[in-house]
């Protein structure tokens, strides 16, 4: 490994790897995570980030590192506060902390894709519990939703579902985050 991204769980690994590979294939990203040997490392809940910082674990590996977490916006306010605290700790350590603009990674899934695959129309917002809503609608465990559908998201859909407006400018959150991550080792 040439660098690491600290993430909460296995779905985050699927999310980042697939998005980077798809965006690279379409030319929206210069490289995939594998190309630049950046490895997502599962650390469990957001509370573990604090220990990685205070115990210098990532630093002791001698590799560039950053953190990628769900923002949980629209969820438990205490959790949102906890994530903001972790962000401050990571940034004070001189590292980059990425929190999703949407509540969780499942909120980036394309409802049309889910309907194409399952025949079930599902509606969700950027800040609702999409994982639960989709899971209930299609009859699967919420924790399996991302791993089932995300690998079938095209680059076009990934860009479309992560587009936001910054003033008059249209930007793609996932292209920006992944560009920063893949350039971390350069």
Task: Please describe what each predicted stretch is.
Residues 1-186:
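Acidic, divalent-metal-binding catalytic cores of TOPRIM
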């Amino acid at each position: 490994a040439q660098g690491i991204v600290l993430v909460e769980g296995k779905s985050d690994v699927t999310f980042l790897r697939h998005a980077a590979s798809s965006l690279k294939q379409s030319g929206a990203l210069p490289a995939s995570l594998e190309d630049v040997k950046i490895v997502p490392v599962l650390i469990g809940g957001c509370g573990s980030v604090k220990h990685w910082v205070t115990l210098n674990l990532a630093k002791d590996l001698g590799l560039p590192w950053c953190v990628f977490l769900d923002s949980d916006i629209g969820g438990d306010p205490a959790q949102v506060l906890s994530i903001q605290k972790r962000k401050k700790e990571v940034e004070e350590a001189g590292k980059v902390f990425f929190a999703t603009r949407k509540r969780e990674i499942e909120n980036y899934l394309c409802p049309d894709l889910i309907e194409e695959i399952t025949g079930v129309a599902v509606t969700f917002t950027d800040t609702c519990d999409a994982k639960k809503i989709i899971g209930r609608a299609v009859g699967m465990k919420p924790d399996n939703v991302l791993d089932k559908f995300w690998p079938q998201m095209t680059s076009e859909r990934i860009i479309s579902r992560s587009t936001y407006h910054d003033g008059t400018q249209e930007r793609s959150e996932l292209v920006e985050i992944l560009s920063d991550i893949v350039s971390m080792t350069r």
